[in-house]
Each structure stands twice: as structure tokens, then as C-alpha cells.
Amino acid sequence: MQKRDDAFSITINDPDLIDESAIIVMETINDALLLIFKENSIYRLLTADSTDPQKTQPDTGHTYEKIATIGAASPYVARIFLQFKRIIDQVFPEDSIKPKLLEQVWSLNEQLLVCAQFESNIREQLDDVMQKCDTIIEQNKSSRAIPPLAKVKNLESDAKSFLLVGKQFLIDCFKLISLFTDLPLGARDEAHFDKHIKWLQQNRPTLKKLSSALGNDLFWIRRLSECRNAIEHPGPGQSLTIENTKLHPGNKFSLPTWSYDLTNKINVKESSIPIHQELDAYLNNMLYLLEEILLFCISESLPADGMFSIYQHNEADIKPNCPIKYYASLSAKFYSRLKPS
């Protein structure tokens, strides 16, 4: 019988998820967390020692648990943790902010994946709901009474949960910036995003591109944040309502929408916005926001000797099963120093 400390190989056989895609890579975070990235899912490896640290049962086996049904083939995974884990390992020494940085990047990626799952829960029901609504209306259009339309299940829970996790993601993005810049963040003002951007403009002029990018993103950042606040603290000028499928004049129907009035804090008031479209837009914005923060902050933190630079892969070199876009390598300037004179 194989001993628990022997080298071993592992095959993922998850009874709850039929995912025959390949294991793309396994990554560790500070020797405390081992992650298995398949094309379409992510697992956490639980070694025998983590299950039985006192080694009281020598036959204790290794196991694993599912983290996400989104894997390395998704930009939400490849373009965040997998991309920047390689860059961070290459350019940061162990006695730097590296351990904390890796923890924060993975935590943010987990939040992004949670939001992606909430969005997917809604979006993946839409085709079926539309077909059912069309059938109900078609079969009953000659009648004066149309039965209730098909609904998106768990709509309100998933939509509101997206906003709750989404706002925390935004706060944690600025905590990530603080790790690089010492941006002051208090418990009472951690969501004062405009204040944080102003501080960066005044105190970190070398990060001008980051401040500019954050300023351009401020509108949607505050809108998401205030939509979340409208859930927790509703009132005049701070409200959000969610509506599932709805019948309209002429026997037409609409997919789920939400309406919000955020005029108590920002000049935003919208009606009947398709929820799935706005969540998709938020997800993409969140991906690009986090990627930009990491690119700008890491670029500013590269060794002063100019040894490394960050480059972008040619489109043809980006792999569909793990579409990493950026990488770190020796800079052209450093290469020139290596050439014999």
C-alpha cells in the first residue's frame, strides 16, 4: 500500500460535475494552499497531512474539493491569478510583499468567480425561460386569460448577491492598491472611492496612469456600490427594485429587469435595465479594473536595475485553454548589458 508521504498523482473524479477537460496547471500559495486548475473548473487539494496533521491514521488519503465551475479557459481565471502568479513569482523576492500579494490576488479572483457564478445562474436560464414564455403566449393568445409566465429562478437572490460581493470586490481592489502605496483606508471610509483616487493623485504621482484609469472607472464603480447600498439601506433617492419576466401590452414579454434611484448620493436613476446585460458589463469592468491595477502597480514596483519588463503576448500566441495576455521577462535594456562589448 502506498504511504501517505510518497509522491502521488491525482485524477479529478467529481460526481457532481462531469468535467473531462484537462488539468492545465497546479499552483501553490505560500505553501499553504494547493490549487488544481482544469480548463473548466478549479479544485483545492487537501493533502493527508491537512486532514490528519497529527498523523494518527497512516492510511488517511489525499482528497480535493471543488472551488469553482469556471476554469483556466476563462479570462476571469487566466487573466488574474494564473497570469499574475507567474509575474509575481518572477519579479518579487520572498522577503517582500509577495506572500500578502498572492493571498490578496487569489481572494479577489475568488470574489470575481463568485460574481461570475451569480451572473451565470441568471444568464443560463434565459433561453429556456424565453422559449417557455413564447409557448405560453402562443398557445393562449386567442384566450382572454394568459397563464403566468415562466420565471428566472432565484433571480432576486442572485442579483442582490452579485452586488453585495461586487462592492466588497471593489473595496478589496483598493486594499490591494494600499499594499503597494500605503493608501490610508479606514473602516468608515473604505468605500469612499473618489477620496482614494484623489489621495493617489496627490501622493503617488508616479502612478498617474493608474489614477487616470480609476477616475475613468469611477462612474460604474460608484453605481455598483450605491446599488448595493440601496439594498441594505433603502430610502428616498436610494432604492432598487427587481422585476422578473413580465407581460406587456400586445402580449409581449420582457426578461428580468431592475430599476434604481441613486440620486441621494449620485445623479443616477434608471428604469427597466436588463439585469443580465448589466451584470455582464460589471463583470468585464471588474476584470479589467483588477488587471489594470496589478499591471500598473507591479510595473511601478519592478526592480530598479531595470532587469524585468512586462510584455503582452501576440494574439496568435494566446492559448485558448489558458488565455494569459501578459508576462514578465528580461528587459531589452538588461539584455543589452549582457552582450559582450
Which residue ranges define each predicted feature?
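Acidic, Ser/Thr/Gly/Pro-rich intrinsically disordered interaction regions
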Residues: M1-L113, Q117, N121, E138-S157, ...
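A glycine-rich, hydrophobic loop/mini-helix early in the fold
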Residues: I122-I136
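Extended HEAT/HEAT-like alpha-solenoid repeat tracts in very large eukaryotic scaffold/adaptor proteins
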Residues: D158-G166
